[in-house]
Amino acid sequence: MPGGRYLWYAGREARFYNNCYLLRLEEDTREEWAGVTERAMTCLMTGGGIGVDISRARPSGRQLRRTGGVASGPIPLLNTLNQAGRNVVQRGRRRSALYGSMNWQHDDAGKLLHAKNWHDMKVGNTTLAELKQADFNFPAPLDMMNISLNYDDAWLNNPINSTFMENVRQAMMTGEPGFSFNFGDKQDETLRNACTEITSEDDSDCCNLGSVNLA
């Protein structure tokens, strides 16, 4: 039998997408930022979860040739998708499933590593971590999204590096970011579904997990 949301929506009048979709920011342009946001929201509001790799976004502060300004970097895009997931509740009953990842050598990898350090984020006389502890739904950066760094063949040449060790430390402290390992002929398969069992290198690929009823 099909799994996941195929079963969830079985027998219901409305027809929705099912399971999760794997997305990639194909290039760092305004048009593609809008495009991946549209793809994500379409999947979310019609029943699918999403996983998105934003490694192709330019690092924050990089000069923009067309406008003369500077790039915002990939983290604001993840925050945009996080907000979409916060506000799109499927069928008014089910929260969105989100996953975001970035290559470990990206110049903004350090920012992703510490994006969920809510215990360091002051709000008045308290911290975001304490507010989240008191109210699970209190908004915080990337709180709707699982995040990971992608490790490829280049990492194998120097696995005990500062980025990886900081990733380990952060994972022990906060549980995130996670680790996505992609080696050899699979190193470009950095796209994941929200639960991360399915891998692909193709944008808009679909999770095809199934289930068997043993009852």
Descriptions of predicted regions:
Residues 1-215:
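Extended catalytic cores of very large enzyme megasubunits
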